[in-house]
Structure formats: structure tokens, C-alpha cells
Design a protein with these regions (language model features):
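General structural signal for secondary-structure boundaries
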Residues: 60, 128-129, 193
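Conserved lysine of the Walker
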Residues: 9
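P-loop NTPase switch/communication element
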Residues: 14, 18-66, 113-117
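Walker A (P-loop) phosphate-binding loop of P-loop NTPases
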Residues: 6
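Hydrophobic alpha-helical segments
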Residues: 23, 120-123, 178, 182
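NTP-binding/hydrolysis catalytic cores, primarily Walker-type P-loop NTPases
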Residues: 135, 152-194
């Protein structure tokens, strides 16, 4: 999921988790526990930790992703990717049998999210951009973009499918996009359409 601050990414991620088969082993990884996944019997919650006053004892999102991979998860949910941990989420988790893994990130639209993922991966691994783009294109299926519109409501604004890597770039296709049709009682009217 992508979107700006306050777009509803975490809320939407919680809602999406309701559709995960309840028998799956799910591991959540967060900086601060915000996810509220319900009804899953085999749920493991991991939370990052800051270093103490002596600068020791830090546990990063990247550390937790590596640990989660040894816990035999069916899927991994990272509350938000912000930096080099994206390498482990993409390369180690999503490309190694943990399909259906999910995360959120800040971006203005799905294409910007792809560029942010590329940049975050470059922070954590020394690979050519083309190799990173191929990994991202192989790991991701869709990006759901959320946003706050002018009446302050939160909406799914776009669903973008990742088709693969071709002609030197990640190929995408817009599946659905929010179309505004007007206003009524100061509320924006519209729907998400193909």
C-alpha cells in the first residue's frame, strides 16, 4: 500500500488482513505496534527497539525481517518500509516463497512508490539499478494507492498491477482508478473504476 501521511495505509492493511486464510502463519514487523490483525491463530508480532543510552541493544526492522524468515512464516507483514530493510523484504521474503506478504510506504502515486522502493533497496545493497528493478518487478504483484481527497475522506485512489520488467523499466498497468463525478453536501462523489 502506498499513500501520504494520514491516507489510511495502516487501516487498509488491517482490513486487508481479514482476507488472509486464518490457518496461515503470519509474522508482523513494526517500529511501533499499530497493526490490529484479528482472528489469526498463528500470529507472531515483532517490534523494533531503539538502542539504550549506551548505544547498545537496538533491534532494527531489518534484523526482525531476517529473524522472521527463520520462523517459517506463510507471509510477512511489515508495517512500513522506510529504508534499507526493503532489500530483505523484497529479496529475502517476497522472492523466496512468502508471496502475499504486505507492507506500506509513503509515496504520491504507485509509480513514485516503485521509485522509492528502488531507492530504498539501493541504500541496502550494491547492485545495478537494472538488477534491483528486476527483483522489484518479480516480487510485487500490485500497489494499492490511498489518499485523502479534498473533502478530507480517505479513498483507494488507484490499484496498479506490476506486469514485470521489460524495455529497461518496470511495466505496470492501472487496474482501477478513483473517478470523481461531483459533490453532494460538501462530500466528493465518485467511485473506483476500471
Amino acid at each position: 500500500m502506498s499513500g501520504g501521511t494520514g491516507a489510511g495505509k495502516t487501516t487498509f492493511l488491517n482490513a486487508m488482513s481479514d482476507f488472509i486464510p486464518k490457518e496461515e502463519r503470519i509474522i508482523t514487523i513494526e517500529d511501533n505496534a499499530e497493526l490490529q490483525i484479528q482472528g489469526v491463530e498463528n500470529l507472531v508480532r515483532l517490534e523494533a527497539r531503539e538502542a539504550n543510552l549506551e548505544g547498545e541493544g537496538a533491534v532494527t526492522i531489518r534484523d526482525l525481517i531476517k529473524s522472521a524468515l527463520r520462523m517459517r512464516p506463510d507471509r510477512i507483514i511489515v508495517g512500513e518500509v522506510r529504508g534499507e530493510e526493503t532489500v530483505d523484504m523484497i529479496s529475502s521474503a517476497m522472492l523466496n516463497g512468502h508471496s502475499g506478504s504486505m507492507s506500506t510506504g509513503h509515496a504520491n502515486n504507485p509509480k513514485d512508490m516503485l521509485h522509492r522502493i528502488e531507492t530504498m533497496m539501493m541504500m541496502g545493497i550494491d547492485l545495478p539499478l537494472q538488477a534491483i528493478q528486476r527483483q522489484v518487478a518479480s516480487a510485487l504483484d500490485i500497489i494499492i494507492h490511498l489518499g485523502r481527497i479534498r473533502d478530507k475522506t480517505r479513498k483507494v485512489l488507484m490499484i496498479e498491477e506490476i506486469l514485470g520488467y521489460e524495455d529497461g523499466k518496470i511495466q505496470t498497468k492501472t487496474l482501477y482508478e478513483f473517478k470523481e463525478v461531483g459533490t453532494e453536501n460538501e462530500k466528493v462523489k465518485g467511485s473506483i473504476m476500471k
